[in-house]
Design a protein with these regions (language model features):
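Juxtamembrane membrane-water interface segments that cap and precede transmembrane helices
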Residues: 53-56
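Hydrophobic cores of alpha-helical transmembrane segments in multi-pass integral membrane proteins
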Residues: 1-13, 25-48, 58-210
């Protein structure tokens, strides 16, 4: 239910026309899709009709949760790169990375889930009968794509580690107060006195006033 609620929020943002295709957005959507696949798989596995206990099916669901968390974390690092370092992350590489991670993660998760439905034992189970050998190769390919996505993601944030000129305080047109602070921030975080905060989106309020 929480996953569906988050997808509903994303859909509402797109519907209202305030959605921007940025690397951060692609990371977030990719993480949500991976988590959604894992959630659906877990729901399917709960039916007694599918005998998934002791198979690699459960590992596929676990992979979905771990990979979704990883993708979301990398997206956060990319999004806040100007607050973490002194340069903005590479946006072009940042848009490619989540797509690679999404494709690779889905290959790994779906391969494990499908193979588990066909009876392949879990990694710690001595019984390796059943399953689909082709799905094992799909999982290997998916793992390689995930590794490539990780390297691309790390390459995208390398500029944040370099010293350079001050970056814009708000490169994303953010809505919360951290985007009002310059990077790096002065003593006290803000250069001027803050206007009263009257909503959860104070920067959006300031733009409307202008």
């Amino acid at each position: 239910v929480p996953v569906l609620a988050l997808l509903g929020v994303v859909g509402d943002v797109v519907r209202r026309g305030s959605f921007r295709v940025t690397a951060g957005a692609l990371y977030a959507i990719s993480a949500l899709l991976i988590l959604l696949v894992g959630t659906v798989a877990a729901a399917v596995g709960s039916f007694p009709t599918f005998e998934t206990a002791g198979t690699i099916f459960d590992l596929g669901v676990s992979h979905a949760v771990v990979l979704a968390s990883l993708v979301a974390s990398l997206g956060g690092i990319h999004w806040w790169s100007t607050k973490i370092g002194r340069q903005q992350a590479n946006e072009a590489m940042g848009r490619v990375a989540p797509l690679l991670l999404l494709v690779g993660s889905l290959a790994v998760v779906l391969a494990d889930v499908i193979s588990g439905l066909f009876g392949e034992g879990a990694e710690l189970n001595a019984d390796w009968t059943g399953g689909m050998e082709a799905m094992n190769w799909v999982a290997v390919l998916g793992t390689a794509i995930v590794a490539l996505g990780l390297l691309t993601s790390l390459g995208a944030v390398l500029p944040a580690l370099k010293a350079g000129t001050d970056v814009p305080a708000d490169p994303w047109e953010g809505q919360t107060l951290e985007w009002l602070a310059p990077s790096p921030p002065p003593l006290g975080n803000f250069e001027a006195e803050l206007a009263p905060v009257t909503s959860a989106e104070p920067l959006a309020d300031l733009r409307q006033e202008k």
